[in-house]
Amino acid sequence: MSSRKIIHIDMDAFYASVELREQPHLKGRPVVVAWEGARSVICAASYEARQFGLHSAMSVATAKRLCPQAVYVPPHFDLYRQVSAQIHAVFRRYTDLIEPLSLDEAYLDVTRNFKNIPYASEVAKEIRAAIFAETGLTASAGIAPNKFLAKIASDWRKPNGQFVLPPHKVMAFLETLPLGKIPGVGKVTLKKMQSLGMQTAGDLRRFERGELLNHFGRYGYRLYDLARGTDERPVKAERECLQISTEITLPEDLPLEQAAGHLPHLAEDLWRQITRKNVEAQSVTLKLKTYDFRIITRTLTYSSVLPDCTALLQAAQMLMARVPPQTEDAFRLIGIGVGHLVPKNQQQDLWA
């Protein structure tokens, strides 16, 4: 087992918590972050709203039936990004090995940290305290020898808690871990596992690699390792990139049409980033991740720059239409990105 010390930090109901911080009179009420509209979906739900069964990616229409008294506030992605930058500034006091997963979660490798703190649990405790002191928001943390285990651990004491999974306790922990707790195991995969008599990671571990490959294809390699607590992926430090993108990991696997419901707010979020960076883009890429971790991408490249958010959304919807609607596929992530970036006004806009 690896001797690395990995922390997974996950902010608690991040978007909703930021909105509650800005509008404290809403505290204690079920709050939903979403644009209202017939085809809108929830971006985030407060813990009070979750008690009624509301969750991100649920349609607003369904949410209103389940919880008519919920308060709806539109998302403010620029604000979320500002708060996320504050949180990352806290991370950088301890390590430069930071791998952001989204605005509200990240992996940190603190095996060697700037403050020479020997215990990763103490590093996590300090980080969580600093985040709360500086933003008023709570975070949960998982501490483990690798990224896979740290991500599971961060969910164990939510909200506002942390859980340590040392190497010598990993196998016992996995023995009774429900399969649905394994990141990436969605409804489709879980149903197949259960049909094979599996309920826990311990059950999964009793299958040979060849059997898993037979039942799950290439994903069987990953399942074989995860059942044994093995994950050698390094924490990849953030690097400057030649494109701008945004994506969302869905809380449950969704068919293509429902996943497409996220495109409008993804496009709006991405357009804000483009505007803030003062650049223009000539290509649009759609990214989808299936329940078994296959990546599907589609790209459109234009001879001129995208003029506005509407054009960006239209391009993303055109790309979505190019994805074969295979009924057996369920999707756990959707994202869009832009490339072929140029400084604003450098290239004449030929869309007009």
Curated annotation (Swiss-Prot):
List of residues binding Mg(2+): D10, D104
Domain UmuC: 6-186
CDD domains tied to this protein: PolY_Pol_IV_kappa (cd03586)
One GO-annotated biological process of the protein: DNA-templated DNA replication
GO-annotated cellular components: cytosol
Main location: cytoplasm
Cofactor names: Mg(2+)
A family per Pfam: IMS_C
Reaction catalysed by this enzyme: DNA(n) + a 2'-deoxyribonucleoside 5'-triphosphate = DNA(n+1) + diphosphate
Enzyme class: transferase
GO MF annotations, alphabetized: damaged DNA binding; DNA-directed DNA polymerase activity; magnesium ion binding
Catalytic residue positions: E105
EC number: 2.7.7.7
Similarity field: Belongs to the DNA polymerase type-Y family.
Summary of the function given for this chain in its UniProt record: Poorly processive, error-prone DNA polymerase involved in untargeted mutagenesis. Copies undamaged DNA at stalled replication forks, which arise in vivo from mismatched or misaligned primer ends. These misaligned primers can be extended by PolIV. Exhibits no 3'-5' exonuclease (proofreading) activity. May be involved in translesional synthesis, in conjunction with the beta clamp from PolIII.
Assembly and interaction partners: Monomer.
Protein name: DNA polymerase IV
Organism: Neisseria meningitidis serogroup A / serotype 4A (strain DSM 15465 / Z2491)
